[in-house]
UniProtKB/Swiss-Prot annotation:
GO terms for biological process: tetrahydrofolate interconversion. Keywords: ATP-binding, Ligase, Nucleotide-binding, One-carbon metabolism. Belongs to the formate--tetrahydrofolate ligase family. The lineage of its organism: Bacteria, Pseudomonadati, Bacteroidota, Bacteroidia, Bacteroidales. Signal peptide: none annotated. Pathway: One-carbon metabolism; tetrahydrofolate interconversion. Its EC number is 6.3.4.3. ATP binds at T64, K65, A66, G67, I68, G69, K70, T71. It comes from Phocaeicola vulgatus (strain ATCC 8482 / DSM 1447 / JCM 5826 / CCUG 4940 / NBRC 14291 / NCTC 11154). GO terms for molecular function: ATP binding; formate-tetrahydrofolate ligase activity. This is Formate--tetrahydrofolate ligase. It is an enzyme of class 6 (ligase). The gene is fhs. It catalyses: (6S)-5,6,7,8-tetrahydrofolate + formate + ATP = (6R)-10-formyltetrahydrofolate + ADP + phosphate.
Length: 555
């Protein structure tokens, strides 16, 4: 079979204006970024139509290090639904350069279920990540200048919370010292870099309702504390207007096309392990405005992405999914059954049977939110019929709909079985009104306990001294009603990435809590998770090149 980029290049794209027209988007409200990409003015969102659309979340069991194909299934399902006559748009996150050149590769789908042009989407796209990175680091520069200019007059800060960001994986930048050298180089202080998808600016962009809300949230970003323990925000710095200007164009959702020329929105890109893991509210609502069915995905496993989708995104956006699709692979189930990563492609029915406990736990958790769930088996060429049949039978015994997805090899035709199951399930048994994992009024400790104990399976919650201090600050500053966003490993229900399966009765250690007052959420850092990833021993960058003007190795 051809590589992803070979398939992408073999498809003759249609002009984005044609995609817009066929979708019902007025072309006078799009701004072209070349022939095949456009931004759509957020004024085109119609809240009445949003409430009429069928929103479907695609999530997954705990993934392998190579991922699980959730984006491919999301795109494939959209193709399949369009194939059976249901007007459908997929709304996805933008890829980050970090994993694109690091371990996972790109995030534009795969095979014959991709969003196009995949090379541009995976690389610089419309410059949204550049704008977010620039806006974040502009705040850093302006804050450092404020500290320098006020170094002798008592108006400086006792504590600086704001770090920098960069859209690459670079472990050496996690902790740095700035302002070294002569005094004219600024105040010497400890700092560090997070990856751009973990930026609070990214979260704000994805949660903002409009430009006015964007500015309000930027004003509220907490930068540090004064010497008399008062919070110091971007509003105090006086630069909210300038930062909003940098993000003005980035706020508009990006319109592209699938491998079968149907519309797709790709906008925003927070990771689900270190951020809230969902594309922008504006892009999702735009898709819902112009479609009868909207497919969206949330990053990594359901313990991370789906929980945050329900408890943060849906809560803020006022939307409820009619159905959740849980993506499963035989490879991941075998890993959870004790097979090492290098042997998960080999048939092993006994290991798969053991690993099904991970799927069952995710199913139980999704039902905790009142969701009707169907299982999409994302098929690989090395899956045996016995493995597929076992999972199908297991799901049938549990009363869960099951369909095989072959969109990677067959495009929309390979997702018709899944599409028909989705439509039938929504018509006969749609999800109940969303039941959140916690209430806004719950204390922060209660919120953490409800997610960690009820969903992850923890038996005890412990806090570092730094986290305990933050809990006190949160109450004093009036941030206690914010939802929580737990940052932890994506490879386990626990905080230990080496413990697979359906682990229970473990200690859940809260290392720190980051107060994202602009995004209006509390990032709870658990275990040893890093908000700036490192590169693997053999990064994807080693396989990417340009030959005769054509990009090779991008996936």
């Amino acid at each position: 079979m051809k590589t992803d980029i070979e398939i992408a290049r073999s498809i003759e794209l249609v002009k984005i204006k044609q995609v817009a027209r066929e979708t019902g988007i007025p072309v006078e409200h799009i701004s072209n970024y070349g022939r095949y990409i456009a931004k759509v003015d957020e004024s085109q969102i119609n809240e009445e139509k949003v409430q009429q659309s069928n929103l479907i979340l695609v999530t997954a069991i705990t993934p392998t290090k190579a991922g699980i194909g959730k984006t491919t299934v999301s795109i494939g399902l959209a193709l399949g639904l369009n194939k059976i006559g249901k007007k459908t748009i997929v709304a996805l996150r933008e890829p980050s350069l970090g994993p694109c050149f690091g371990m996972k590769g790109g995030a534009a789908g795969g095979g014959y279920a991709q969003v196009l042009p995949m090379d541009k989407i995976n690389l610089h796209f419309t410059g949204d990540f550049h704008a977010i990175t620039s806006a974040h680091n502009m705040i850093s520069a302006l804050l450092d200048n404020y500290l320098y200019q006020n170094r002798d007059n008592g108006f400086g800060l006792k504590e600086v919370l704001w770090r920098r960001v960069l859209d690459v994986n670079d472990r050496s930048l996690r902790y740095i010292v700035t302002g070294l050298g002569p005094k004219t180089n600024g105040i010497t202080q400890e700092s560090g870099f997070d990856i751009t998808p973990a930026s609070e600016i990214m979260a704000i962009l994805c949660l903002a309702k409009d430009e006015k809300d964007l500015r309000r949230r930027i004003e509220n970003i907490l930068l540090g504390f004064t010497y008399d323990n008062k919070p110091f925000t971007v509003k105090d710095l006086g630069v909210a207007g300038a930062i909003t200007v940098l993000l003005k164009d980035a706020l508009s959702p990006n319109l592209v096309q699938t491998t079968e020329h149907t519309a797709a929105f790709v906008h925003g890109g927070p990771f689900a392990n270190i951020a809230h893991g969902c594309n922008s509210i504006l892009a999702t609502k735009m898709a819902m405005t112009f479609s009868d069915y909207t497919i969206t995905e949330a990053g990594f496993g359901a313990d991370l992405g789906a929980e945050k989708f329900y408890d943060i995104k849906c809560r803020k956006a006022g939307v409820t999914p009619k159905l959740t699709v849980l993506v499963v692979t035989a490879r991941a189930l075998k890993m959870h059954g004790g097979v090492s990563q290098d042997k998960i492609k080999e048939p092993n029915l006994e290991a798969l049977k053991q690993g099904v406990a991970n799927m069952d736990k995710h199913l139980r958790n999704l039902r905790y939110f009142g969701q009707t769930v169907v299982v999409a088996f994302n098929r690989y060429g090395d899956d045996s019929e016995e493995e597929v049949d076992y999972i199908r039978t297991h799901c049938e015994k549990k009363g869960v709909g099951f369909a095989v997805n072959n969109a990677f090899t067959d495009g929309g035709e390979g997702a018709v079985e899944l599409a028909e199951l989705v439509v039938k399930t929504i018509e006969e048994q749609p999800s109940e009104p969303l039941q959140y994992a916690y209430d806004d009024e719950d204390s922060v400790e209660t919120k953490i306990s409800k997610v960690a104990c009820n969903l992850y399976g923890a038996s005890i919650i412990t806090y570092s001294a730094a986290a305990r201090k933050k809990l006190k600050h949160i109450v004093e500053l009036g941030y206690g009603n914010f939802p929580i966003c737990i940052a932890k490993t994506q490879y386990s229900f626990s905080t230990d990435p080496k413990i697979y399966g359906a682990v229970d009765n473990f200690e859940f250690h809260v290392q720190d809590i980051v107060m994202n007052a602009g995004a209006e959420m509390l990032v709870v850092i658990a275990g040893e998770i890093m908000r700036m990833p490192g590169l693997p021993k053999e990064p994807q960058a080693l396989h990417i090149d340009i030959v005769n003007g054509e990009i090779e190795g991008l996936s």
